[in-house]
């Protein structure tokens, strides 16, 4: 008994032997949603740019800070806070020294502020420096200097010293040397950005660059240490910073300490 042949056209359609037919139909249905999504993202970027005093879209800042909380450093936090620091410190930001990794980025951001001169100290060897960073190093604006040793500057060379992600990697033994030296080169004060205890860090990146994981300490630990070192919190700067931050709805993802300079 002969078998009745099936409908080849039906089998062809059911077996999905035309792989692009379904995808083309699906693409035609999803393309309006894709277009709407692109318009929404573009609008967010434009709105963020319009309302950001720093020149970096708020949306992008939010994205970067979220990444920072998931395992990156506080250096981007320091960059984001620069306009707020300018409001809080005013003329005390005429000559600024930044100390910490990726200092070229921070110095470049400081240069965009009116009436601000900036210098930077990179505590670690700079790998794959871009053209801008190489230029800053050639001009002597940025230096590579192990902060366990004295900085190559005279006393009170700068109005303000901003430190990010540099002290988190030092033991108390080296902090005893480094923190007083940072205060030595400042005439008006120090601003320290430090990670919160329990904050996630990119372990592989940390070990390859810094040689050790960060020692993330509590605010109470830092305040006790500042007192032992003879440094006092700058209450006036703290109040002005908090007021400026509130106006911009700025909520830092790192600890920020404002210290008075030695007198």
Task: Locate the predicted segments by residue.
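A short acidic, Gly/Pro-enriched loop at the edge of an enzyme's catalytic core
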Residues: 148-161
């Amino acid at each position: 008994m002969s078998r009745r042949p099936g409908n080849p056209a039906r089998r062809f359609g059911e077996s999905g032997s035309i792989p692009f037919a379904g995808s083309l139909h699906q693409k035609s249905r999803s393309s309006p949603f894709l277009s709407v999504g692109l318009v929404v993202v573009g609008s967010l970027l434009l709105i963020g740019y319009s309302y950001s005093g720093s020149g970096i879209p708020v949306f992008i800042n939010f994205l970067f800070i979220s990444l920072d909380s998931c395992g990156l450093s506080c250096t981007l936090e320091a960059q984001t806070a620069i306009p707020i620091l300018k409001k809080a410190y005013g003329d005390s930001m005429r000559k600024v020294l930044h100390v910490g990794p990726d200092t070229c980025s921070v110095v470049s951001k400081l240069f965009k502020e009116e009436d601000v001169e900036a210098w930077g100290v990179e505590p670690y060897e700079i790998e794959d420096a871009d053209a801008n960073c190489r230029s800053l190093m050639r001009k002597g604006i940025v230096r590579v200097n192990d902060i366990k040793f004295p900085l190559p500057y005279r006393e009170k060379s700068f109005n303000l010293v901003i430190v990010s992600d540099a002290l988190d990697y030092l033991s108390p033994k080296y902090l005893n040397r480094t923190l007083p030296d940072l205060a030595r080169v400042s005439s008006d004060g120090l601003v320290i950005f430090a990670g919160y205890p329990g904050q996630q860090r990119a372990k592989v990146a940390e070990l390859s660059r810094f040689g050790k994981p960060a020692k993330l300490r509590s605010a109470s630990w830092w305040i006790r240490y500042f007192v032992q070192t003879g440094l006092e919190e700058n209450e006036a700067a703290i109040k002005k910073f908090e007021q400026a931050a509130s106006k911009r709805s700025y909520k830092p993802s790192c600890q920020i300490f404002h210290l008075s300079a030695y007198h």
